[in-house]
């Protein structure tokens, strides 16, 4: 449940950011790239049957978010 709360907090932060801050946008872009790569690795592992966990995908305007049960 804490993962879901953290995910929602991140999404709310993205929606509430001021678009005039170039440094934070750059940081967000790097963070988003890293998150997308982690999401893709997890999704690939799930698709090839390496993990037998529930995978949930939440698609928003801020991006797609994946997490799985452990």
Curated annotation (Swiss-Prot):
One of its GO terms (molecular function) is ubiquitin protein ligase binding. Changing residue 21 to H: In strain: NVIII-1, NVIII-2, NVIII-5, NVIII-9, NVIII-18, NVIII-22, NVIII-24, NVIII-41, NVIII-42, NVIII-46, NVIII-m11, NVIII-m12, NVIII-m13, NVIII-m15 and NVIII-m19. The keyword RNA-binding does not apply. GO terms for biological process: cell fate specification; negative regulation of Notch signaling pathway; nervous system development; sensory organ development. Keywords: Developmental protein, Differentiation, Neurogenesis. Changing residue 20 to L: In strain: NVIII-5, NVIII-9, NVIII-46 and NVIII-41. Coiled coil: none annotated. This is Enhancer of split m6 protein. It comes from Drosophila melanogaster (Fruit fly).
């Amino acid at each position: 449940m804490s993962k879901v709360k953290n995910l929602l907090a991140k999404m709310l932060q993205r929606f509430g950011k001021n678009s005039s801050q170039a440094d934070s946008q750059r940081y967000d872009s790097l963070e988003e790239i890293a998150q997308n790569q982690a999401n893709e690795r997890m999704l690939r592992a799930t698709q090839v049957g390496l993990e037998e966990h529930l995978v949930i995908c939440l698609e928003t305007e801020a991006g797609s978010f994946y997490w799985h049960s452990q």
